[in-house]
Amino acid sequence: MQIRSIRGFTLLEVLVAVLIFSLGLMGLAGLLAVSVKTNHAAYMRTQATFLAQGMADRMRANVLGLWKNSYNLTTTAPLVFPQAAPATTCSSGSCTYADVATRDLAVWQQQLAQFLPSPTAMIACATTQTPTTDQMLSLPPYSGTCEMQITWGDVSNVASKTNNSETVSFDWVFQP
């Protein structure tokens, strides 16, 4: 009895190996796509955190503006870049606390529009005290709390077939 060799079996093994290898590559590509989307969302959250911290530092530096509620803000329409230049540059050194607060808010809105897609912002500060101007300058930091909310459109979390963006929000309650 003669044993006949089976022809073409090696080619079938190679085709199965190529199929398994290509499925593995497609899985790796999907993993890479999810990683890029997640990394972008984390980057946007980091930008919002840095911008919020920067605004809180500006508020702490302008104690009178903070006590006089000059930093309260609500934007309803998404901010677009470039924003209009601040009304006052405060370069002459003759700015009031309200001028400094107005400039701080204008610069902050410009930064939001530059670094986040379709952002809106809200700052609301509330205190239970109403001290005099001299007391404001000598008292410890602001006695109330401020709430800051930054929202932006995050297109990285939406299915690719839709044109809508998911709204992401950064909320922070702090004492300046």
Task: Describe the residue ranges of each PLM region.
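Aliphatic-rich helix starts adjacent to a transmembrane/signal segment
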Residues: 2-53
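Flexible, low-complexity segments enriched in proline/glycine/serine and punctuated by aromatic residues
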Residues: 16, 40-45, 49-176
